[in-house]
A protein has these predicted regions:
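Short, Lys/Arg-rich N-terminal segment immediately upstream of the first membrane anchor
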Residues: 1-4
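Short, exposed beta-strand/loop patches in secreted or surface proteins that constitute
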Residues: 53-56, 77-84, 108-109, 147-156, ...
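N-terminal Sec/ER secretory leader and immediately downstream segment
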Residues: 54-83, 88-93
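Acidic, serine/threonine-rich low-complexity disordered tracts
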Residues: 182-217
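N-terminal leader/targeting segments and the immediate start of mature chains
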Residues: 6-70
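Hydrophobic lipid-interacting interfaces of membrane-associated proteins
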Residues: 67-72, 97, 168-170, 202-210
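An acidic-aromatic
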Residues: 78-131
Length: 217
């Protein structure tokens, strides 16, 4: 009986060690692979000045989503491009973080290169940029390779992956109304489990600020 237990214990330890080595030394968990994977895909969107041009990449339609913290609230905008030639529509929503209650909801429409809002005043307060980050910056694998890498992650279990950088990017800082010299954490995430395009760009800082932009089919 004791011999059987020793064999079982050895098998368990061996299995755990195998999984650890698989995760630690997965060939996909390296900077070059992840930057090629992420950079190649996000360059399809960053930059795109006219939202209607996204139909060139996603002829079956797309969704663009953005969220950022504003005081004690979170502001989200989600637009859906359902059909080429038709207006791209959605909502701009302010939500109290504690209660989860929507305090302001603004209808948004993008057509012929222009945003229109059901409440222009509220829109200018909640979304002063009145543009998405992908309309302002260029991202690709060559650019990512020049940044200071903070961390990387790849999961063999579900195929999710992430890259985190410490950066000072004047264009991004200007878009977020940050000081030009501010250092931010810039992250990119995706997953092999998503058959269609689904990538997020996240900006955070040491003071707890959070910004996320996601484009997906």
């Amino acid at each position: 009986m004791m011999k059987v237990r020793k064999i079982l214990f050895a098998c368990i330890i061996g299995g755990v060690l195998f999984i650890f080595l698989l995760l630690k030394y997965n060939p996909r968990n390296n900077r070059a692979y992840l930057e090629n994977r992420i950079g190649t895909e996000v360059s399809r969107v960053y930059p795109t000045q006219n939202l209607e041009d996204l139909f060139e990449q996603f002829p079956n339609g797309f969704i663009v989503y953005q969220a950022h913290l504003m005081n004690e609230n979170i502001v989200k905008i989600k637009l859906t491009g359902a059909e080429k030639g038709a207006p791209i529509k959605g909502e701009l929503i302010e939500t109290e973080r504690k209660s989860g209650e929507n305090t302001r909801v603004v209808s948004v429409e993008y057509y012929n290169g222009k945003y229109t809002f059901s409440d222009e005043k509220a829109a200018s307060e909640l979304w002063p940029q009145q543009s998405f980050l992908f309309q302002k910056i260029t991202l690709n694998k060559d650019f990512l390779s020049t940044l200071k890498l903070k961390d990387k992650y790849y999961s063999s279990m579900n195929g999710s992956f992430e890259l985190n950088y410490d950066v000072n990017l004047p264009e991004t800082n200007e878009y977020l109304s940050f000081p030009a010299s501010k250092t931010i954490e810039l992250s990119f995430g995706g997953s092999n489990s998503n058959r269609n395009y689904y990538y997020s760009v996240v900006v955070e800082d040491k003071d707890g600020y959070y910004f996320r932009e996601t484009v997906y089919e």
